[in-house]
Amino acid sequence: MNLQFLFIFIAFCVMLFAQIVTAKPVEAEVAQPKLYQRGEGGNGMEPIPEDVLNEALNA
């Protein structure tokens, strides 16, 4: 029983080590948040144009 447990434990450690070694770093692409305004006639939301947004932020 102890030998079987030892074998399973070693196999688990080897599999865990293989997962860690072969893991690729996750390169998360951070999306720029967009600000929205009410569309023409209230038909939903549309993104604020960047030039208008920059002008408002720099005022």
From Swiss-Prot:
- Its signal peptide is 1-23
According to its record, what are the GO cellular component terms?
extracellular region
Where found in the cell?
Secreted
Q: Which domain of life does this protein belong to? A: Eukaryota
Task: Identify the main location.
Answer: secreted
Q: Which UniProt keywords apply?
A: Hemostasis impairing toxin, Platelet aggregation inhibiting toxin, Secreted, Signal, Toxin
Membrane-crossing residues? none
Query: According to its UniProt record, in which tissues is this protein expressed?
Result: Salivary gland (at protein level).
This molecule's function is given as: Anticoagulant protein that acts as a competitive inhibitor of host thrombin. Inhibits thrombin-mediated host platelet aggregation.
Oligomeric and partner information: Interacts with human F2 (thrombin).
Q: What is this protein called in UniProt?
A: Salivary thrombin inhibitor XC-43
Q: Which organism is it from?
A: Xenopsylla cheopis
